[in-house]
Amino acid sequence: MKPILPLALLLAACSQQPAEPTLTTGVFAGKGSGDRLCIAGEPGNYRGGLIVFGDGDVNCSASGRIEVADATLALVPRGEGECRIPLSIDGGAIRIGQVPAACSYYCGPGATLSGNAFSLASQAQTRDGSPAKAVDLAGDPLC
């Protein structure tokens, strides 16, 4: 009878793990006309991408997986070991926190990710009236 008690306690402890939060997926628009963030996938397998423009066509752009740990989110660019772009959900907006120096590779001179905010762009359209999309400078999808 004694071996059953530790097994029961172990199973009870495992069942109390918090589930990964469900994120709203789709395209989010930033303050600039081309600033976009996208989230796709499902819990445990989210991916994301973003592009933020500075002056002219100078920009920051990255895509990869969305890492969820405790109450924090981060975009981890593909092939990256050190860069974690911190994200937070603030009501209906997604905000980028203070981006570490390890992520500077993803920005051109004068462009920055830190402090940008994005709102769900379900009805947002581009200048020519087409639906908003999250694409890089070459037109390739970020998600």
Q: What is the role of each PLM region?
A:
Residues 54-100:
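Contiguous, well-ordered beta-strand patches that form the walls/edges
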Residues 1-8:
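Sec-dependent signal peptide recognition
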Residues 20-29, 44-49, 68-76:
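Short, hydrophobic/aromatic-rich segments at coil-to-beta transitions
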Residues 20-37, 117-127, 131-142:
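Tryptophan-anchored aromatic micro-motifs
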Residues 11-13:
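C-terminal motif of bacterial Sec signal peptides marking the signal peptidase cleavage site
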Residues 81-129:
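Surface-exposed, polar helix/loop patches in the mature regions of secreted/periplasmic/lumenal proteins
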Residues 15-17:
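Bacterial signal peptide processing site
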Residues 36-69, 142:
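N-terminal glycine/threonine-rich, aromatic-flanked beta-hairpin/loop signature
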